[in-house]
UniProtKB/Swiss-Prot annotation:
This is Small ribosomal subunit protein uS19. The keyword Transcription regulation does not apply. Keywords: Ribonucleoprotein, Ribosomal protein, RNA-binding, rRNA-binding. One of its GO terms (molecular function) is rRNA binding. GO terms for biological process: ribosomal small subunit assembly; translation. The gene is rpsS. NCBIfam families: rpsS_bact. The lineage of its organism: Bacteria, Bacillati, Cyanobacteriota, Cyanophyceae, Synechococcales. GO terms for cellular component: cytoplasm; small ribosomal subunit. Belongs to the universal ribosomal protein uS19 family.
Amino acid sequence: MGRSLKKGPFIADSLLKKVEKQNTDNDKSVIKTWSRSSTILPLMIGHTIAVHNGKTHIPVFITEQMIGHKLGEFAPTRTYRGHIRDKKGAKS
């Protein structure tokens, strides 16, 4: 279930301030954030935001198709290394 329209999208205040400051300064440096639940807004297009996945910050370049999604969707937290193979010649 989505967020109520009358409330508007959630975005961390500190992240919003950093993006707006970079827009006024025409600066496109990487912004580090731990706020995976922040919604991607149109004013973020063209920025690179480093989203924390629990271990490191993963750089995410924001495009038009990402608007309305959350930052955490583009920084996976789990690594899949494949299923364990059976030993060769093992009998059940």
